[in-house]
Amino acid sequence: MLSDDATAALRARLDAADYTLDAVLDRLGEAGRRGLERNSTTPARDALGAPSADDPQATLARLWILQDAVEAVAVSSALGDVVGPLVAAGLLVPDDDAFRAAAVVRPYGAEATASTPAIAGWICHDPLPNLDGHAGAPRPDHVLGISPASTTLAQLSIRRPVASALDLGIGCGVQSLHLAAHADRIVATDLNPRALDLARITTRLSGVDADLRLGSLYDPVAAETFDLIVCNPPFVISPPAGARLTYREGDLPGDELVRRVLVEGAGKLNPQGTMQVLCNWAIVDGEPWDERLAGWLRPTGCDALVLQRE
């Protein structure tokens, strides 16, 4: 994957191109932003104007946000000596006299709150498979970018200062960017090696110090406890047979993965610690919707606040 030196050089190139959230959103305009929310790149492409090797901001937006094949001369002008390491790491793919992105680098940010400063950085994740109506299938180890679920968790998470935080299932790394604003120490885990590779780029580009570890659930932190645990697990309940996408559904039957996240997580909390999780759980005929969760959580001795939505 990308070395520390190459990541630092990439960040310098992103800064030089003004490839930041506010600048790019301003460049795309309202029509471009709304189009991308619908997975349509046409309004954004119009806003960026004609391709030019003298416009590194537009070049990077075309390469990573619109997922275009971009002329090699323009990519080289925007990224300079970083092109070689990106190709060697498999993050940039030659395509005749152009380059395509095999992983996306997007600017990210969040406004300051009463308890945390503003966040500014970049997120690295896999390309969107359905941009502009394309029907491409994601790779089994696909690393999802910013989603409504990850945004919801970031918005709901308690932001009081803590000494230690666990990002369980780091994915692209967005929760760790938020944790860095109020946690002295961050440990982040994932069973998907590609997720750790891309999250490492996310955290290093964004100046976040996180201890990234490979492993399933709480295995990588067996001897540790935390003040805060956040988790957006692969909670989709799917039929027992069929292919799985690592980011979406686990290998355990039904809602067993969610049960383990909650029950085992209770034992990983320090006194007065908090765990915040997005999840699905099975609702069984004849059983109140909350009884299944209560049966899991009562033996832990923890208080639980459950918000249910359709």
What does each of the following model-derived ranges do?
Residues 139, 147-231, 237, 282-284:
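Conserved SAM/SAH cofactor-binding pocket of Class I
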Residues 200-201, 241-243, 289-291:
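Short amphipathic alpha-helical segments
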Residues 192, 254-307:
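Conserved Class I SAM-dependent methyltransferase catalytic core
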Residues 75, 153, 232, 261:
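Residue-level signal for inorganic ion chemistry
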Residues 95-165, 170-182:
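SAM-dependent Rossmann-like transferase core, predominantly class I methyltransferases
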Residues 1-131:
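N-terminal auxiliary segments of SAM/dcSAM-dependent transferases
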Residues 193-194, 231-260:
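Mobile active-site "lid"/loop adjacent to the S-adenosyl-L-methionine
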